[in-house]
Amino acid sequence: MNIEDFDYHLPESLIAQTPLKNRDQSRLLVLSKDTGELTHLHFRDVIHYFEPGDTLVLNDTRVMPARLFGLKEETGAKVEMLMLTQIEGNDWEVLLKPAKRIKKGHRLNFGDGKIVAECIEELEQGGRIMRLHYEGILQERLDELGEMPLPPYIKERLDDPDRYQTVYAKESGSAAAPTAGLHFTDDLLNKIKQKGVHIAFITLHVGLGTFRPVSVENIDDHEMHSEYYQMTQETADLLNKTKESGKRVISVGTTSTRTLETIRRDHPQFVATSGWTDIFIYPGFEFKAIDGLITNFHLPKSTLVMLVSAFSNKKYILNAYHKAVEMEYRFFSFGDAMLII
C-alpha cells in the first residue's frame, strides 16, 4: 500500500490553534464504519450512541511539562531539551536543540542547577540519552522549570496548560496529549456513567513519534515508534466481562486502541500487563478488542489516518475527511472529533 493513498488536502486555516471555551462544544462527525453514512452533531451528543453495559476506555496518561530551557555547562550556550521517554531510573531519551555540539559527557544546567542533565549516549536526529541529577521529586522540578510541549503545527501559546490535559489525566509520562479525550468534561462522564456505561482506564505514555511523518513510500516498510503501556487487573476484568456479555468496548483515541489491540494480539483475553508496544495498525489489520472508536482528525499520510482506515475503510474515511474540510471542521489536537461505530 502506498503512502499517497492516505493523503488529503487540508487548508492550513482549519488547523485549530486554540481549544474551544467549553470542551464538549466541539463538533462530532459520526461515521458508520460499515456503511459510510455520516451524521453531524456536537460532542456532548456522543452519549446517545452508548448503551447500558458498554465500556468506554480512556487513557489516563498526563502530559509532562517536559520542555526545558537551560545552558551548556562548559560554554554557557543556550540549549532546549524536550524529555521524551524514561528509559530506566533517571535516564531519559530526549531531543536537544541545538544538538550537534552536545556530546557524550557534556552537562546541561537548568534552573541554576535544580536539574543537571549529563549526556551518556548520542542518538540520531538530535536524540540523546541524558542522565538527570536533581534534588527531591522530578515532577516537582518539572512543574517549576518546564513548559508544556505542544505539537509542531500549533503556533500560538497556550494560555491555560490544563487545556492540553484531559480532565482525568493522572499518570505523568507523556510528551503529547491523548487528544480524543480532551472533549470530555466531568459532567459528561458522570452522565455517561448514569446511563449504565462503564468507564475503564488504561495508560499509554504518548511519545513524539506520534507526530513523526512516514518517510517511506510503501507503508509495509514503515517502522513504528515504541510507547509504554499498562493495564490493571480491574480494567482487564471489566473488559472481559463486557465482551462476554455481548456489549461493546468503545475506545477513546488511537492510544487506547493501540494498547487494547496489543494486549488482545498477545493474549486470548484481556490481562493485567505492562510493556512497550510498536503495533502498526493499517488496512488489513484484524481488530480483536474494540467495537467503536472516538478520535480526532489526523494529519494527512499519518499512521493515525491508516489506523482509522483499518477500523472502517479507506474510502469511507477519506470521504468523511473531505466532507469535514468542506464543512470547515477544526482539525488535529484542539480540533473536532469523530465517532466511528
Swiss-Prot record:
GO molecular function annotations of the record: S-adenosylmethionine:tRNA ribosyltransferase-isomerase activity
GO CC annotations on file: cytoplasm
Catalytic reactions on record: 7-aminomethyl-7-carbaguanosine(34) in tRNA + S-adenosyl-L-methionine = epoxyqueuosine(34) in tRNA + adenine + L-methionine + 2 H(+)
Assembly with partners or alone: Monomer.
PANTHER family, A to Z: S-ADENOSYLMETHIONINE:TRNA RIBOSYLTRANSFERASE-ISOMERASE (PTHR30307:SF0)
Family assignment from sequence similarity: Belongs to the QueA family.
Name of the protein described by the UniProt record: S-adenosylmethionine:tRNA ribosyltransferase-isomerase
Organism whose genome encodes this protein: Staphylococcus epidermidis (strain ATCC 12228 / FDA PCI 1200)
Taxonomic path: Bacteria, Bacillati, Bacillota, Bacilli, Bacillales
Gene that this polypeptide is encoded by: queA
